[in-house]
């Protein structure tokens, strides 16, 4: 539990207590001040007094005792904006219709952009009503920022841009996400029902999970129809009757035969001209048809792009969405089980990805189709690190930014998957371990054999011992998933490094001859922070270099 008083604060483990013990007794036992019996306090957001007994309070794991209630975020009804990328993320902020919402570097902005690449007043957002569709949309305007603002890779024009669906905006080094409606549904908060267990936990009922979004359907590419060339002019059919007529005139001495003979070449020439004209008309008609089909093809590609970005967001939600799930808490909390196909998939950033949908007939596409597929780009799409088969994410860069990304990855692991399906362990150099003390609050860190112990090690000797223990006894872990954080330049050095062995466990699983055993084996994912790329272990399947 946590004490958050002005004159006394800290984190403590409560091993045992008597039912008649009061909150005042508990605070005094930690070395805190003696409080009057009637002093109002809060256990999380529940009002109590210093004289309230623990039997009445029913202490919960992670409880916070303070003079102010713990605030929970609320879902924004209607359009909202949040920082979803960069070194900081925020909770959703409502977009007003009465005035423009200001995003910029100014400390007085509605959304403060923590980057030097943003202008003092960089972006304006305002909800507007569309009379033609009777819907609410958002007007995006750039009041003359230095570096501009970008949507789908295009700079927002001077006259602004109106959007009607979820939109990602690049503003300097930051990413803003606009949402037309809340994407989450709040679950009952722990302690809101009389179901607190003797161990200080409350049951969390996961509703049935909807199926994962499937990949976009295959796209039918347009093909040109073959317009047959007109037959070549037949000289024999035109000249033959003339020669025959000349012979008949010479033999029969009758000029009328010449007049009849002339009809045949006239008909031949007329038919040839008509076929040429029809061929030209068919070519124009086919060209127009193909151009129209290409426009429809581009629309289908754009729809597939939106569907694929939506699928990637579902597979790897952005840090702001993950944070909201944890703080609400949301019904989507801990929805990934050990058998889920998206176990151990992580959102590492936002970027532009070359991607093309599958074609119904992939062989020999038209050159125009091939050009579109080769240059198709998913703008502002989630960058996904897939560690379902093992491996690690290596992070290299400035300490502050590297820690921010690593914390984001840990938050994702702890939010997507519950402690019944995922164990999280941390090993760090002694000088870096203080940056990870906060993780001891995660239930995923508890050792099954001793709930008072955590999978946390500081220094090389202690870390090597814990990592070797995890590697040797990995199949006896109560959870199928294991996420290991290694914050060190020395723990992954040497051929005898237990950290290397543990992070490479996925390779051992893939080489198992018994496929049934491999399917039920533990899944190990790593998050490794290092000072340079050459210090990362070979098991890193994704590397993030922060400039």
What residue ranges belong to the model's regions?
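Long, compositionally biased intrinsically disordered regions
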Residues: 57-60
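Major-groove recognition helix of helix-turn-helix-like DNA-binding domains
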Residues: 40-41
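Accessory regions of macromolecular translocation/handling assemblies
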Residues: 1-19, 25-36, 46, 52, ...
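Intrinsically disordered, low-complexity Pro/Gly/Ser/Thr-rich segments with frequent PxxP/GP/PP motifs
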Residues: 64-66
């Amino acid at each position: 539990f946590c004490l958050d008083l002005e004159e006394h604060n800290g984190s403590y483990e409560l091993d045992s207590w008597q039912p008649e013990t009061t909150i005042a007794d508990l605070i005094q036992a930690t070395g805190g001040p003696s409080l009057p019996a009637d002093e109002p306090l809060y256990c999380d957001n529940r009002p109590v007094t210093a004289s309230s007994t623990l039997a009445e309070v029913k202490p919960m794991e992670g409880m916070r005792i303070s003079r102010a209630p713990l605030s929970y975020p609320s879902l924004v009804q209607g359009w909202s904006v949040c920082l979803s990328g960069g070194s900081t993320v925020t909770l959703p902020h409502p977009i007003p219709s009465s005035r423009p919402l200001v995003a910029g570097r100014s400390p007085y902005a509605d959304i403060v952009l923590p980057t030097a690449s943003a202008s003092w007043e960089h972006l304006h957002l305002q909800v507007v009503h569309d009379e033609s569709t009777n819907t609410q949309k958002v007007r995006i305007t750039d009041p003359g920022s230095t570096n501009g603002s970008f949507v789908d890779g295009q700079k927002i024009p001077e006259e602004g841009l109106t959007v009607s669906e979820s939109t990602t905006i690049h503003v300097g080094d930051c990413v803003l996400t606009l949402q037309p409606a809340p994407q989450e549904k709040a679950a009952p908060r722990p302690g809101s029902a009389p179901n607190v267990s003797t161990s200080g936990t409350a049951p969390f009922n996961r509703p049935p999970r909807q199926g994962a979004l499937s990949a976009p359907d295959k796209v039918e590419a347009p093909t040109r129809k073959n317009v047959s060339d007109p037959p070549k002019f037949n000289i024999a059919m035109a000249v033959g009757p003339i020669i025959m007529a000349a012979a008949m005139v010479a033999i029969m001495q009758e000029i009328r035969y010449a007049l009849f003979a002339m009809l045949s070449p006239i008909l031949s020439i007329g038919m040839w001209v008509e076929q040429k004209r029809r061929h030209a008309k068919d070519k124009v008609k086919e060209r127009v048809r193909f151009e129209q089909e290409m426009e429809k093809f581009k629309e289908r590609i754009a729809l597939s792009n939106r569907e694929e970005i939506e699928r990637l967001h579902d597979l790897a939600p952005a840090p702001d969405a993950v944070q909201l799930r944890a703080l609400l808490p949301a019904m989507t909390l801990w929805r990934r089980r050990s058998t889920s196909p998206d176990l151990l998939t992580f959102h590492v950033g936002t970027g532009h990805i070359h991607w093309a949908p599958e074609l119904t007939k992939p062989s020999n596409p038209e050159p125009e189709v091939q050009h579109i597929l080769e240059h198709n780009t998913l703008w502002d799409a989630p960058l996904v690190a897939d560690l379902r088969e093992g491996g690690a994410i290596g992070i290299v860069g400035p300490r502050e930014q590297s820690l921010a990304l690593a914390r984001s990855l840990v938050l994702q692991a702890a939010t997507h998957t519950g402690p019944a399906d995922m164990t999280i362990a941390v090993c760090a150099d002694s000088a870096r371990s203080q940056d990870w003390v906060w993780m001891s609050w995660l239930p995923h860190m508890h050792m099954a054999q001793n709930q008072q112990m955590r999978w946390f090690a500081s220094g090389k000797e202690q870390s090597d011992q814990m990592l070797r223990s995890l590697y040797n006894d990995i199949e006896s872990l109560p959870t199928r998933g294991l996420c290991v954080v290694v914050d060190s330049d020395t723990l992954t050095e040497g051929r005898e490094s237990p950290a290397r062995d543990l992070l490479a466990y996925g390779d051992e699983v893939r080489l198992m001859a018994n496929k049934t055993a491999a399917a039920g084996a533990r899944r190990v994912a790593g998050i490794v922070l290092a000072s340079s790329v050459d210090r990362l272990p070979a098991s890193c399947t994704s590397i993030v270099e922060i400039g």
